[in-house]
Amino acid sequence: LQETVVLDDDTETMVSLVGKRQVPILVKDDGQAMLESMDMVRHIESIGAPVLTGPERPEIAAWENATAPKAAPLTQPRYPLLGLPEFGTVAALDHYTIRKRKTLGDLVELRARTRELLRELTPRLEELDRLIECPQAVSGALSVDDVRVLPVLRSAAVVKGLRFPDKVRRYYETMMDRLGYQPLPAV
């Protein structure tokens, strides 16, 4: 697989591939574009020997669905500060800031409310701490559950002052190391 970064203001590329402004997009070898993340995961799993063989637990999907809205006001205002490639031009960075201001509010004000917003996210992380079965895989063996949880944690880890509960921290560190990912900076 080859990764290509689409600048945040490059709506034309997104629309030409999938008919709307959305990422990530997976373009398969036959040229067909896929838009839904879990469809992409299942497609990639079908290419070789399956890796995500563990159980899918409904409580993990429920955790993700309940946690993502709590994390967004903390994480998304920080993305412009991280030097991410999708904000590689002033126009792309401005585009993101304007878009997020419309949906979340003022990004500087949201960053100033970090302590308050962390109080809302912390119970979700404590719940995950109770759900994690082992540091190597949230449900005991690698599964789609890990694909649901790890991106939320990787995003949340950009929040300076956030402390993961013990099992969450061990899981996050183990998975990042296992995948060879460097954590994003905390700001």
Role assignments for model-derived ranges:
Residues 1-95:
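GST-like domain detector, emphasizing the conserved glutathione-binding G-site
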Residues 18-21, 132, 179:
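A structural signal for short coil/turn segments at secondary-structure junctions
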Residues 52-54, 137-141, 184-186:
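Short, hydrophobic secondary-structure boundary micro-motifs
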Residues 67, 170-186:
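Short, mixed-charge aromatic SLiMs
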